[in-house]
Amino acid sequence: YVGGACVKDSTIINGKKIDFAQGATVLGMMPNFIYKETGLSKKIKTFCPENPKLIYFENDNTPTRIFREITLLEKELKDRWNEKGDVKAFRNDENKVIEFIQKIYKEGTPPNLDQAVNEIGKDLTKLWIKGSAKDLLDHYFTSEKTKVYMGMTVIESSPSSYNEKGTSFTIPLMDSGSVFGGYWGFVKQGIWKISDELLELNNELGIETILNSEINDIDTNKGRISYTNNNLDSKIYYDYLLFCTDPLTPT
Protein backbone atom coordinates (compact mmCIF):
# COMPACT_ATOMS: atom_id res chain seq x y z
CA TYR A 1 0.00 0.00 0.00
CA VAL A 2 0.99 3.64 -0.45
CA GLY A 3 0.56 6.09 2.36
CA GLY A 4 3.63 6.78 4.48
CA ALA A 5 2.29 7.74 7.90
CA CYS A 6 -1.25 7.26 6.56
CA VAL A 7 -0.80 3.71 5.29
CA LYS A 8 -3.61 1.20 5.68
CA ASP A 9 -3.86 -2.54 6.12
CA SER A 10 -6.74 -4.97 5.76
CA THR A 11 -8.17 -7.91 7.64
CA ILE A 12 -11.17 -10.21 7.36
CA ILE A 13 -13.86 -9.99 10.05
CA ASN A 14 -16.92 -12.24 9.75
CA GLY A 15 -16.06 -12.88 6.13
CA LYS A 16 -15.88 -9.17 5.25
CA LYS A 17 -12.74 -7.28 4.26
CA ILE A 18 -12.08 -4.38 6.62
CA ASP A 19 -9.50 -1.66 5.98
CA PHE A 20 -7.89 0.04 8.97
CA ALA A 21 -5.22 2.67 9.59
CA GLN A 22 -1.77 1.51 10.68
CA GLY A 23 -0.62 5.01 11.54
CA ALA A 24 -2.39 8.36 11.42
CA THR A 25 -6.19 8.39 11.42
CA VAL A 26 -7.12 12.07 11.04
CA LEU A 27 -6.46 14.75 8.43
CA GLY A 28 -5.19 18.14 9.50
CA MET A 29 -1.71 19.22 8.41
CA MET A 30 -2.32 19.40 4.66
CA PRO A 31 -2.25 22.93 3.18
CA ASN A 32 -5.56 23.88 1.61
CA PHE A 33 -3.95 24.94 -1.68
CA ILE A 34 -2.64 21.39 -2.15
CA TYR A 35 -6.04 19.97 -1.25
CA LYS A 36 -7.71 22.20 -3.84
CA GLU A 37 -5.15 22.34 -6.65
CA THR A 38 -4.57 18.58 -6.81
CA GLY A 39 -8.29 17.99 -7.16
CA LEU A 40 -8.48 16.03 -3.90
CA SER A 41 -11.31 18.26 -2.68
CA LYS A 42 -13.50 16.93 -5.51
CA LYS A 43 -12.60 13.27 -4.98
CA ILE A 44 -13.03 12.70 -1.25
CA LYS A 45 -15.52 13.55 1.46
CA THR A 46 -14.41 14.97 4.79
CA PHE A 47 -15.89 15.95 8.12
CA CYS A 48 -14.51 18.23 10.82
CA PRO A 49 -16.40 18.45 14.15
CA GLU A 50 -17.18 22.00 15.22
CA ASN A 51 -18.30 21.13 18.73
CA PRO A 52 -15.77 21.80 21.50
CA LYS A 53 -13.28 19.05 22.23
CA LEU A 54 -13.89 17.43 25.62
CA ILE A 55 -10.91 17.00 27.94
CA TYR A 56 -10.87 14.81 31.05
CA PHE A 57 -8.16 14.70 33.65
CA GLU A 58 -7.98 12.14 36.43
CA ASN A 59 -10.92 12.36 38.87
CA ASP A 60 -12.87 14.71 36.57
CA ASN A 61 -16.60 13.99 36.59
CA THR A 62 -17.34 16.48 33.83
CA PRO A 63 -15.16 17.47 30.88
CA THR A 64 -13.40 20.74 30.17
CA ARG A 65 -14.55 22.13 26.83
CA ILE A 66 -11.98 23.48 24.39
CA PHE A 67 -13.93 26.16 22.55
CA ARG A 68 -12.76 27.63 19.26
CA GLU A 69 -14.04 31.07 20.27
CA ILE A 70 -11.29 32.63 22.34
CA THR A 71 -13.49 34.43 24.90
CA LEU A 72 -15.36 31.23 25.74
CA LEU A 73 -12.09 29.31 25.93
CA GLU A 74 -10.54 31.85 28.31
CA LYS A 75 -13.53 31.61 30.65
CA GLU A 76 -13.61 27.81 30.53
CA LEU A 77 -9.92 27.44 31.31
CA LYS A 78 -10.17 29.96 34.13
CA ASP A 79 -13.24 28.30 35.66
CA ARG A 80 -12.09 24.68 35.27
CA TRP A 81 -8.31 24.83 35.50
CA ASN A 82 -7.79 28.13 37.36
CA GLU A 83 -5.85 29.46 34.38
CA LYS A 84 -4.55 32.98 35.06
CA GLY A 85 -2.33 33.40 32.01
CA ASP A 86 -2.95 35.02 28.64
CA VAL A 87 -4.82 32.54 26.47
CA LYS A 88 -5.70 35.20 23.91
CA ALA A 89 -2.07 36.24 23.45
CA PHE A 90 -1.06 32.60 23.01
CA ARG A 91 -3.59 32.08 20.21
CA ASN A 92 -2.79 35.41 18.55
CA ASP A 93 0.97 34.81 18.57
CA GLU A 94 0.53 31.22 17.43
CA ASN A 95 -1.53 32.44 14.47
CA LYS A 96 1.32 34.77 13.44
CA VAL A 97 3.72 31.81 13.37
CA ILE A 98 1.17 29.66 11.53
CA GLU A 99 0.72 32.34 8.87
CA PHE A 100 4.49 32.36 8.38
CA ILE A 101 4.57 28.56 8.04
CA GLN A 102 1.70 28.59 5.56
CA LYS A 103 3.38 31.31 3.53
CA ILE A 104 6.60 29.33 3.04
CA TYR A 105 4.55 26.19 2.29
CA LYS A 106 2.90 28.05 -0.57
CA GLU A 107 6.18 29.51 -1.81
CA GLY A 108 7.91 26.14 -1.59
CA THR A 109 10.88 27.67 0.20
CA PRO A 110 12.80 25.94 3.02
CA PRO A 111 12.31 27.78 6.31
CA ASN A 112 15.25 29.55 7.92
CA LEU A 113 15.69 31.59 11.06
CA ASP A 114 16.66 34.82 9.31
CA GLN A 115 13.45 34.74 7.32
CA ALA A 116 11.48 33.98 10.48
CA VAL A 117 13.00 37.00 12.25
CA ASN A 118 12.08 39.22 9.29
CA GLU A 119 8.52 37.89 9.15
CA ILE A 120 7.48 37.49 12.80
CA GLY A 121 10.20 39.29 14.74
CA LYS A 122 13.10 38.28 16.95
CA ASP A 123 11.07 37.67 20.11
CA LEU A 124 8.50 35.35 18.55
CA THR A 125 11.23 33.48 16.65
CA LYS A 126 13.12 32.85 19.88
CA LEU A 127 9.99 31.79 21.75
CA TRP A 128 8.04 29.86 19.11
CA ILE A 129 10.75 28.38 16.88
CA LYS A 130 14.12 28.22 18.65
CA GLY A 131 12.91 27.69 22.20
CA SER A 132 11.64 24.76 24.22
CA ALA A 133 7.97 23.87 24.53
CA LYS A 134 8.28 24.22 28.31
CA ASP A 135 9.51 27.80 28.10
CA LEU A 136 6.80 28.63 25.58
CA LEU A 137 3.99 27.22 27.72
CA ASP A 138 5.39 28.77 30.91
CA HIS A 139 5.43 32.13 29.14
CA TYR A 140 1.69 32.17 28.48
CA PHE A 141 0.06 29.88 31.06
CA THR A 142 -0.05 29.28 34.81
CA SER A 143 -2.12 26.09 35.02
CA GLU A 144 -0.30 22.80 34.61
CA LYS A 145 -3.43 21.32 33.04
CA THR A 146 -3.46 24.02 30.38
CA LYS A 147 0.22 23.39 29.68
CA VAL A 148 -0.34 19.65 29.37
CA TYR A 149 -3.22 20.10 26.95
CA MET A 150 -1.62 22.81 24.80
CA GLY A 151 1.64 20.86 24.66
CA MET A 152 0.18 17.46 23.83
CA THR A 153 1.23 17.71 20.19
CA VAL A 154 4.89 17.81 21.24
CA ILE A 155 4.81 14.39 22.87
CA GLU A 156 2.43 12.76 20.39
CA SER A 157 4.43 13.78 17.31
CA SER A 158 7.98 13.15 18.49
CA PRO A 159 10.02 11.49 21.26
CA SER A 160 11.46 14.86 22.28
CA SER A 161 11.32 16.29 25.77
CA TYR A 162 9.42 19.51 26.47
CA ASN A 163 12.74 20.89 27.68
CA GLU A 164 14.60 20.48 24.39
CA LYS A 165 15.33 23.55 22.30
CA GLY A 166 13.28 23.71 19.13
CA THR A 167 10.31 21.75 20.49
CA SER A 168 8.19 24.90 20.76
CA PHE A 169 7.95 24.90 16.96
CA THR A 170 6.03 21.61 17.03
CA ILE A 171 2.97 23.34 18.50
CA PRO A 172 2.27 25.83 15.65
CA LEU A 173 3.51 23.33 13.08
CA MET A 174 0.86 20.80 14.09
CA ASP A 175 -1.81 23.52 13.82
CA SER A 176 -0.58 24.84 10.47
CA GLY A 177 -2.78 22.76 8.18
CA SER A 178 -5.45 24.78 6.42
CA VAL A 179 -7.89 22.18 5.07
CA PHE A 180 -9.91 22.62 8.27
CA GLY A 181 -8.47 25.96 9.35
CA GLY A 182 -5.87 24.49 11.69
CA TYR A 183 -8.17 21.84 13.12
CA TRP A 184 -8.26 18.11 12.46
CA GLY A 185 -11.01 16.12 10.79
CA PHE A 186 -11.89 12.83 9.19
CA VAL A 187 -11.90 11.36 5.69
CA LYS A 188 -14.84 9.16 4.72
CA GLN A 189 -13.73 5.50 4.60
CA GLY A 190 -10.34 6.45 6.06
CA ILE A 191 -7.42 8.85 5.69
CA TRP A 192 -5.72 6.41 3.31
CA LYS A 193 -8.20 7.61 0.67
CA ILE A 194 -5.94 10.68 0.40
CA SER A 195 -2.97 8.47 -0.46
CA ASP A 196 -5.03 6.32 -2.84
CA GLU A 197 -6.25 9.36 -4.77
CA LEU A 198 -2.76 10.88 -4.91
CA LEU A 199 -1.48 7.59 -6.32
CA GLU A 200 -4.11 7.76 -9.05
CA LEU A 201 -3.10 11.34 -9.82
CA ASN A 202 0.56 10.31 -10.04
CA ASN A 203 -0.33 7.43 -12.35
CA GLU A 204 -2.18 9.84 -14.63
CA LEU A 205 0.95 12.01 -14.75
CA GLY A 206 3.08 9.02 -15.73
CA ILE A 207 4.87 8.67 -12.40
CA GLU A 208 5.99 5.12 -11.61
CA THR A 209 5.43 3.93 -8.05
CA ILE A 210 7.49 0.93 -6.90
CA LEU A 211 6.03 -0.79 -3.84
CA ASN A 212 7.00 -3.82 -1.74
CA SER A 213 10.69 -2.94 -1.93
CA GLU A 214 13.66 -2.94 0.42
CA ILE A 215 16.48 -0.46 -0.16
CA ASN A 216 19.86 -2.18 0.11
CA ASP A 217 22.25 0.64 -0.73
CA ILE A 218 22.30 4.29 -1.77
CA ASP A 219 25.36 5.46 -3.72
CA THR A 220 25.23 9.24 -3.47
CA ASN A 221 28.28 9.68 -5.70
CA LYS A 222 26.69 7.84 -8.61
CA GLY A 223 23.12 8.82 -7.77
CA ARG A 224 22.09 5.18 -7.61
CA ILE A 225 19.72 3.19 -5.40
CA SER A 226 20.05 -0.59 -5.13
CA TYR A 227 16.90 -2.31 -3.95
CA THR A 228 15.07 -5.61 -3.85
CA ASN A 229 11.56 -5.74 -5.27
CA ASN A 230 9.56 -8.97 -5.07
CA ASN A 231 12.80 -10.94 -4.47
CA LEU A 232 14.49 -9.39 -7.52
CA ASP A 233 17.55 -7.14 -7.14
CA SER A 234 17.27 -3.90 -9.11
CA LYS A 235 18.94 -0.51 -9.50
CA ILE A 236 17.51 2.89 -10.25
CA TYR A 237 19.30 6.20 -10.84
CA TYR A 238 18.19 9.54 -9.50
CA ASP A 239 18.84 13.25 -9.88
CA TYR A 240 17.17 14.22 -6.62
CA LEU A 241 16.44 11.94 -3.66
CA LEU A 242 13.65 12.83 -1.23
CA PHE A 243 12.96 10.89 1.96
CA CYS A 244 9.41 10.78 3.32
CA THR A 245 7.83 9.03 6.28
CA ASP A 246 8.17 5.27 6.19
CA PRO A 247 5.09 3.17 7.02
CA LEU A 248 6.53 1.56 10.16
CA THR A 249 7.67 4.54 12.24
CA PRO A 250 4.21 6.02 13.00
CA THR A 251 2.85 2.63 14.06
Sequence positions of predicted segments:
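Rossmann-like flavin
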Residues: 60-165
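Short glycine-rich, flexible loops that bind phosphorylated cofactors or substrates
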Residues: 249-251
